Amino acid sequence: MSTILLPKTQHLVVFQEVIRSGSIGSAAKELGLTQPAVSKIINDIEDYFGVELVVRKNTGVTLTPAGQLLLSRSESITREMKNMVNEISGMSSEAVVEVSFGFPSLIGFTFMSGMINKFKEVFPKAQVSMYEAQLSSFLPAIRDGRLDFAIGTLSAEMKLQDLHVEPLFESEFVLVASKSRTCTGTTTLESLKNEQWVLPQTNMGYYSELLTTLQRNGISIENIVKTDSVVTIYNLVLNADFLTVIPCDMTSPFGSNQFITIPVEETLPVAQYAAVWSKNYRIKKAASVLVELAKEYSSYNGCRRRQLIEVG
């Protein structure tokens, strides 16, 4: 059987750095190599494939279609190589474990501290990177291996066939306002159509479904501000009299009593939370432990559903 000579992994790393840096000169500085050495590596890769991968200009480099394909595939290859090195190194008790994951604000306000404390008991030297946002923001990073997994809300329009989905819990969401607002009894969404609203920025998941509900009740998109910042949401509600819809476990952030829930006649959607990770990469042991801890702490806290508090 003939042996196929494959490109060197280090050459792929150099190619990726050239694209990331935007020029051969900048990449050479980052890599600690000479500019001629980097140029030769790029030339060698192009000779190997027999096509031009980058267009060299005075202002830097741009990718050709073949270069775009190589960049995408090579990033997957080098990430898998890194995961393999970490996994094999992890067999040693002295190894440094790395894990990165995404999570929604609800997790940060509820069981994140307990989950991470427990994880650190198992992996005391682990390097943990956590990112807070909606699940839709994490999907590209999950698919290409930059994130080990993410927790978030699911919705019917999400295409998750290439991902493992581990259901965790359900949560009721409630309409929240500043305590300074005068409210009596139950109201309707339609009666609030002229109010200003603030919601998390996302194009799928729970808030996408909620947006449909709000618009169906006459609330215009022009009256809805979107942001990735939970702090900004609380600030606009507290100091600018905006309305928002958040999980029932987030109505008293850090013990604050500055917010109230407003009962509405309409039924707000219930959020389904799950952990998701790519089927194309074997999940790391450390990431798997975190997912199991998320399941464990979710069960401790029930399904996060509680009755609305009447305002009046």
UniProtKB/Swiss-Prot annotation:
One BP term from GO: positive regulation of DNA-templated transcription
GO CC terms: cytoplasm; cytosol
Domain HTH lysR-type: 7-64
Cross-referenced Gene3D superfamilies: 3.40.190.290, Winged helix-like DNA-binding domain superfamily/Winged helix DNA-binding domain
GO molecular function: cis-regulatory region sequence-specific DNA binding; DNA-binding transcription factor activity; sequence-specific DNA binding
Pathway: Amino-acid degradation; L-threonine degradation via propanoate pathway [regulation]
InterPro entries named among the record's database cross-references: HTH-type_LysR_regulators, LysR_subst-bd, TdcA/AbgR_PBP2, Tscrpt_reg_HTH_LysR, WH-like_DNA-bd_sf, WH_DNA-bd_sf
Organism superkingdom: Bacteria
UniProtKB keywords: Activator, DNA-binding, Transcription, Transcription regulation
DNA-binding region: 24-43
CDD domains: PBP2_TdcA (cd08418)
Free-text function comment from the UniProt entry: Transcriptional activator for the tdcABCDE operon.
Similarity annotation: Belongs to the LysR transcriptional regulatory family.
Protein name as annotated: HTH-type transcriptional regulator TdcA
Species, as recorded: Escherichia coli (strain K12)
Upper classification of the organism: Bacteria, Pseudomonadati, Pseudomonadota, Gammaproteobacteria, Enterobacterales
